[in-house]
């Protein structure tokens, strides 16, 4: 039976959320009950989600608008074009935090709560309804244990943790099952070579509503919007993806086989570090890959599949 799933996403800044959502919608192991938008302009983020769901014939999935915190650049405007939430044929819930609480409390089975951005929505849901811990597993793309960005041999303050560190701390201290992919395993996920060529071919053959085309079109237009970012100076957008951190969290929503998982006591510091500390809460951390190529092949196969 498919696992009831909620995705909380800050889609609309880095493009990896788009790839992650497309992959999620091609994972039969996960039954998506709700998608909520996190931080920044959460209506803009919801519009991106809505357009993707509409194109992929998944307007059965409700969208919850999360707490609008911080400024964020609209890096996906070209792809979004003039689409707005009024065009979405599904349900839009203004109280995204309430929708998280209701969806978890009403679920018959444990929910995979997959979070691929900062987590103020989740901290607010815990404050409003602490009992969600009894019926949900937190799955996050968060932190840095032994390695940092670009495979640096030391941990770093990871974005999803540091921008709202106290919210993240509350989520990690909550008494529920916690599973994360830190930068150690998600910071080197790139589709390139033959895999990227297959994405391009599928996009051309299957048309703009296909997951491959949605990912590729967003990738190319996003790159034009952010090509001045220093980290992208050596990226050729026609031959490879950017780093697709969030894909690994989707996989952890239903499987762990390809990863080396370790239970560690994790403490989130006020300045956004993810520390191993005996006083921390137990978190299952994906520290290394058993077979990263198999994971990249799985993602590619599902994104190029026509059904």
Model regions: which residues?
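N-terminal acidic, glycine/proline-rich low-complexity segments
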Residues: 1-307
């Amino acid at each position: 039976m498919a696992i009831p799933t909620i995705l909380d996403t800050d889609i609309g800044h880095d493009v990896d959320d788009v790839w992650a959502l497309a992959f999620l919608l091609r994972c039969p192991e996960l039954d998506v009950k709700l998608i909520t938008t996190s931080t920044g302009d959460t209506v803009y983020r919801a519009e991106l989600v809505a357009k993707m769901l509409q194109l992929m014939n998944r307007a059965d999935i409700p969208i919850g608008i999360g707490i609008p915190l911080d400024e964020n650049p609209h890096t996906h405007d070209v792809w979004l074009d003039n689409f707005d939430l009024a065009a979405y044929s599904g349900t839009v819930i203004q109280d995204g935090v309430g929708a998280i609480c209701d969806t978890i409390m009403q679920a018959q089975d444990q929910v995979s709560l997959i979070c691929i951005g900062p987590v103020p929505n989740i901290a607010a849901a815990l404050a409003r309804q602490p009992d969600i811990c009894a019926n949900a597993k937190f799955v996050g793309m968060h932190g840095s244990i032994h390695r940092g960005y670009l495979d640096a041999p030391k941990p770093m303050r990871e974005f999803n943790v540091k921008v709202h560190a106290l919210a993240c701390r509350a989520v990690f201290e909550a008494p529920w099952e916690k599973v994360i992919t830190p930068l150690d395993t998600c910071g080197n996920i790139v589709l390139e070579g033959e895999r990227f060529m297959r994405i391009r071919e599928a996009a051309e053959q299957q048309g703009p509503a296909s997951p491959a085309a949605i990912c590729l079109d967003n990738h190319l237009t996003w790159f034009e919007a952010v090509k001045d970012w220093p980290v992208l100076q050596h990226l050729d957008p026609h031959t490879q993806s950017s780093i697709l951190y969030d894909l690994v969290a989707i996989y952890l929503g239903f499987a762990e086989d390809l990863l080396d998982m370790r239970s560690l006591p994790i403490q989130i510091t006020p300045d956004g570090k993810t520390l191993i500390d005996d006083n921390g809460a137990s978190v299952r951390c994906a520290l290394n890959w058993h077979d990263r190529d198999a994971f990249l092949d799985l993602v590619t196969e599902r994104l190029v599949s026509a059904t």
